[in-house]
């Protein structure tokens, strides 16, 4: 009879042999009855409303529709024509007539499922039911493997699924070992020659189970013939193996090693057989449970009422099913098993889509049922089920390879978000859980709009939520809400920020005002309301960056004396402010925006629409598919007709057709459609107020502290680079010039150029104290723009750039799709160099140790300068690069390549263009700011501040960016953000005399601190000098001293007088003093027994023991002269060590012993005797800095 080939919907061609060996590892197939399988219960449920699964305010819940239910249905639709493979119900023999009876019953399925209106295939998101057929097993032949085929026909798609014993061939207890070896052997042959096996599969697909008993007889004959052939082949293989063993017995040592290697395939076969048997037994149970679960869910859905007992029964079945799914997946994907078995397990999981079935059938189905009965069911059922699935999934992902766990990260977030609606009593916990798992998923998944959207609904940081919402509508797999729904979600984000205004964060008021005005710019009526536009502009010009106390973070004169908390707030949120304005400029999902068209947003919207239509057509018969193909062909013909007849169509009609195509997504946007007039017309859809506000915010950040300006300007530079790169790909020269004019006029180039020159000056002033500057400049100087971008994209470490990944505009620079990683936390494979940048707090990007010590500041600064330089070289943006050395300060040593780098600007008169279309563009896009004479004069000395005529070196609080004595508190702890601000430094204009004395003392210690850090400081050597703490210091800091001694960072000595004083203080009436003295005594004794503290007598000699007390018996008045005894001991020890040591060449006196005390009277007495005295703050600060350099813990 003629052969026809029908594609199996669950078959992956490259994995057919593994699927075959999984199903055909049994003896000869036996016919069996085929009971009817019910239709999936999800088609019996009603639609879910968004308000049930969306974190929205109660007032807005009624306006939402079908969000999470769409997620559930979309998850189900991804399983194309789902099929549960058949299993054996019993081991009893079945006769052939039983099979004939079943075939007759297929034409008349159970009325309970056919007559139900809820079971009808009317919804577009329903999944077609495939007809299951007998899986014909074919044993391995001489040149092939065991192939199991399931015959599927699109005409029978609506018929109920059949379950037969022959549909899945399991390994019976009596199966012989030879058949098991055939399975693994066939898999190996398949791996080596997949094309040969695919050819054999195609020839075997021609059988159709639905024809008649003749086909079944043919199948049986074919199976018998294959068995006979296989037995012959096995005999030959056994003979060959025997000969091989005889030869190996006569070989030498090297051949013995080869013999050992030849045994490995046999071992692989045995382990593979064991794995397959285990998975088959699990699969039997899984399919039984799937059938029972679907039947019970269907009965419960069709019934008018529900009993609690029925829900708990379904719960028990479903939880067991989930457990078996998880066991199946972890068994198949166990990383510790042999590689051969892991490959087998991976292919079995992929072919049978076990992971998808776990999610859709094991999780979504019951949640769907629970949603319908949420009003009158026991909430404990929902709670227990969600918790059980959540724990099972979160535990499973730690036991499987990372590339399989990435998908489950997002699904755990989805499950947590669904739990918010189904189990609202734990709203906060599930919301935090959803945010955590979505955050983990976003480390690996990019360009996925639904993920960004779902993250925005649960994210605590409302500014980041606003950015993620913008990314969801401007990425490749874009999320496409209606304008009304988008406005609803934006309003919800603002309301969340407003509700949290009193949570103790004083900066929330700034965020609330920003979100309020950003939301206003996205209103549909905003472009038609000049008054509202003026209100928004006034806010960004006059109020943005000013707190309730009137403190302006963007006042250039105060850039070095900013409040550290205020500084870190804008540092953490600066990148989000930039991304927010960029996403608003590109239209926030408006496809007719010129930037959206440039970055091909309509193309991805059409691809998404076509993908949906293909999914719909896949649920229909093949004729519908052919019809859609014909329609697609007709669309292409229409495109050709339209483009060929443009001469007869007016420009107005052509533009109308162009924008109509964008709205309807009827045809793709071809490059020939992007005429000059079309580009000009798109400017009507550009929110000019939003563009102006973004430029205002950028200019404000450039006037602020350098530390917060860099994280904000870097996304803008990347955005400008992406515009230039994308526009350079346009074929029309006028269109290229169109975008260059927009770039020249829209951005604040005068402020940007001045900022770059000031940044260069600042780097040159710090190059001597920060060697990293020279190293970075040497590395970046020899790279072009493309090489720089490639370098950073392959090893990104800045969180502000990582946040831009996934957007369409960043895809122009480097497309970041979903990546698979080979090992856990190996982020280098996806281009992330510093994975710690991913662990950002909820309050913006992370301000970590590398930011505290300035390392990332220098990396940001050098990257900004060299990217800006190469951007100016590569594209005609109006920036001129001068390489003439210009002297900025007399202290500069122009050994760095930055010493000869200066940025200048073309005059504004050079921007004008005589082309009419471009002239019209100039009347629409205003120049963002005028250009100063200093920046246009190629020979003028650049400005030293963004404020014309100012000098940053004369600003209050200016200092070099390095850790000095003022960066540490009284306990020696580093003060956060102290590198960037002198907020902590006392004011020299104090009227209090004591404060002035302290200020002068601190100023003296600043220079000494920087000298002590140097290894060649002539007065103190940390390997030789002994540090002697007084009793008060031991009482306060005994634990800190113990830590320093254990790390051998310093050498310590102690006067016996101090030790005896501490012993005496153990009898103090003050409990705090008593406890501190006891701790000090214990610490000193421990250090003494470890030879880490040196005891000194009154005479300066080393005592024989720390408990020595002979001198105290002789000097009974020591208690009244403790300070004098300590000073005397230190002075004599210094003299003895000086006389015993070799003379030093340095004219400055070397200090062998240094006294550490915070007692001003004692310090004054010691200084009178020329004893070097330091404070505990100085010593601990010094140790903190030295510990950082040596990677030692000092606290």
Curated annotation (Swiss-Prot):
Pfam families tied to this protein: PIN_4
Subunit structure: Transiently interacts with PEX14.
Stated name of the protein: EST/SMG-like protein 2
InterPro entries found in the cross-reference section: PIN_dom, TPR-like_helical_dom_sf
Encoding gene per record: ESL2
Organism field: Saccharomyces cerevisiae (strain ATCC 204508 / S288c) (Baker's yeast)
Sample GO molecular function, one term: telomerase RNA binding
UniProt record, GO biological process: nuclear-transcribed mRNA catabolic process, nonsense-mediated decay
Segments of skewed composition (Basic and acidic residues): 83-109, 197-208
Region (Disordered): 1-38, 55-130, 179-268, 610-643
Gene3D superfamilies: 5'-nuclease (3.40.50.1010)
